[in-house]
Every structure is written in C-alpha cells, then in structure tokens.
C-alpha cells in the first residue's frame, strides 16, 4: 500500500512540477527574452556528475541553472552544483559559452569544468531534481539532453574556449 501511495504522490508532484515549469518559462520569455545560465561538467575519479529532473523527454542533464542578478558566473556554477548535485566542487576552467535561441527567446549558457571534492547527494524532497549521481563516461544515460551530451563529448576531446550552439 505504501508503494501505491508513494507512486501517487510522485505522479502528483510530477504533474505539479510540469505545470509550474511551463507557466514559469512562458512568463520568463515574456518578461525577459534573454537569459544567462550556467552548467557544469563535474568530474570525480573519472566519472561525470549528472542530475535527473522530475520530468521532461530528456530528464538527465549536467547540473546548472540561471544566474542571479549581480552573481558571478563561476559562483553561480558552484551554487547550482551544490543545489542540484549536493556536492562541493572547485572550478577548473571555462569549457565555453553556448547559445540557444528559439521563438524569440535567447539563452546564453556558460559551461565550466569542475572537480568534485565529495560524493553526490541528491536533494531530498526536491520538486525539480530527483536524482544525482556520477557515471562513467560510457554509462551516461542516452536519455540525457543533447546539449549535455555535446558538452561531455567536447570535454572528453579536450576542447576549450568554445562558442557554439547549445
């Protein structure tokens, strides 16, 4: 019975999360058609940190999010990794700046390469992130978002200073 209740709760949370994210994204696009975000390629012992979002066609991604007004890009990356992945990291370098634009909305993303100083601890009871873990590069989920998969491939090839489409 507990499994049924848990499943119903998770389903309700997923529906609520989808509605909130959709409404938030639409409001953001109207209020501010240009955004700035960060992502992080986080490594530890040859593994890569991925976080799983509650919903979406591609729920696994590199940790990251929006940059707050007046916030330093590297500080935003550190904060996002701590919030989504539950681990402390050190920024090693900037991998590149990326652009994603569609339907009048422009999103710029700075991607940093970081080294983790501890294990991932996914947030408990979080509405957005339901899992965070380190994967060997060949085991990164194929359902990860395409932009994250591209950034991982660029990182593995040793590329730096990129300016590409997300």
Where are these regions (language model features)?
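Acidic, metal-coordinating catalytic segment for phosphate/diphosphate chemistry
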Residues: 2-39
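Residue-level preference for beta-strand/loop junctions
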Residues: 34, 58, 106-108
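Residues that recognize and position ribonucleotide moieties
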Residues: 34, 41, 60, 87, ...
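Conserved Nudix-box catalytic region and its N-terminal flanking loop in Nudix hydrolases
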Residues: 43-83
């Amino acid at each position: 019975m507990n499994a049924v209740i848990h499943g119903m709760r998770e389903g309700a949370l997923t529906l609520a999360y989808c509605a909130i994210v959709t409404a938030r994204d639409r409001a953001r696009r109207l209020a501010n058609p240009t955004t700035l975000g960060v992502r992080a390629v986080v490594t530890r012992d040859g593994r890569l940190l991925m976080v799983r979002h509650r919903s979406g066609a591609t729920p696994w991604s590199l940790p990251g999010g929006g940059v707050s007004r007046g916030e330093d890009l590297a500080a935003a990356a550190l904060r996002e990794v701590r919030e989504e992945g539950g681990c402390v990291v050190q920024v090693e370098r900037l991998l590149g700046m990326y652009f994603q634009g569609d339907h009048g909305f422009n999103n710029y993303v700075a991607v940093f390469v970081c080294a983790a100083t501890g294990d991932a601890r996914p947030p408990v009871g979080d509405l957005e992130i339901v899992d965070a873990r380190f994967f060997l590069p060949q085991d990164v989920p194929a359902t990860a978002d395409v932009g994250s998969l591209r950034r991982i491939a660029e990182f593995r090839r040793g590329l730096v200073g990129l300016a590409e489409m997300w």
